[in-house]
């Protein structure tokens, strides 16, 4: 059974996932031997991914100031903004992979631009889908993308974004991933000429690492 929730903003979704995993997660060890608590197939729909505004709007250029960051969380400010920009940049920046590189350059095609073109040509298109998984490399590598797919749909003048993660570090990565996805969605929506709608994130393995158990409990206590 999938665990499905709908929230107003990104920070709220993150907190609910942390609570769910710490209360109901099963303990398993991953390929590296790390102990985690895991809930399978969490689906979070974020109604206002760009922040509480009462309406849908585009972010000011290169600014994420309207997105609330959980108090005391280590992803914030310039660090969070630079990470979010990687969703749009084709530069790997010395890493084995980045989402932006996989989406914009790795396969020899800019999937973001192609998705924008499809949506400009047909607002109702069901083909504005992008992938990061490269079977030739990722079936043999230990360092593989966690986010596998991003899909865009325009309905009633809004861009609805859906993303799939095969594996998702909820405490350490879900929040910045969601913000980066919002950054990407805002770019696509602006280019297509529509507003930013809901973002839905499906995490097949939603987990928290043992190293973050204590912090996660504190977040829940203070939440």
Swiss-Prot record:
Keywords: Cytoplasm, Methyltransferase, Nucleotide biosynthesis, Transferase
Gene Ontology cellular component annotations, sorted alphabetically: cytosol
Keyword presence, Nucleotidyltransferase: no
InterPro entries in alphabetical order: Thymidate_synth/dCMP_Mease (IPR045097), Thymidate_synth/dCMP_Mease_dom (IPR023451), Thymidate_synth/dCMP_Mease_sf (IPR036926), Thymidylate_synthase_arc (IPR014620), Thymidylate_synthase_AS (IPR020940)
Activity-pH behavior: Optimum pH is 9.0 with [5-3H]dUMP as substrate, and 7.0 with Br-dUMP as substrate.
Enzyme Commission designation: 2.1.1.-
Temperature dependence: Optimum temperature is 70 degrees Celsius with [5-3H]dUMP as substrate, and 50-70 degrees Celsius with Br-dUMP as substrate. Heating the protein for 10 minutes at 100 degrees Celsius abolished the activity.
GO-annotated biological processes: dTMP biosynthetic process; dTTP biosynthetic process; methylation
GO molecular function, one term: thymidylate synthase activity
Pfam families named in the record: Thymidylat_synt
Active site as annotated: 146
Superkingdom assignment: Archaea
Subcellular location field: Cytoplasm
UniProt cross-references to CDD domains, sorted A to Z: TS_Pyrimidine_HMase (cd00351)
Main localisation: cytoplasm
Biological pathway: Pyrimidine metabolism; dTTP biosynthesis
EC main group: transferase
Assigned protein family: Belongs to the thymidylate synthase family. Archaeal-type ThyA subfamily.
Functional description taken from the UniProt entry: May catalyze the biosynthesis of dTMP using an unknown cosubstrate. In vitro, also catalyzes the dehalogenation of 5-bromo-deoxyuridine monophosphate (Br-dUMP) and the tritium exchange of [5-3H]deoxyuridine monophosphate ([5-3H]dUMP).
Classification via PANTHER family: THYMIDYLATE SYNTHASE 1
Subunit structure, as described in the record: Monomer.
NCBIfam families according to UniProt: thy_syn_methano
Protein name stated in the entry: Putative thymidylate synthase
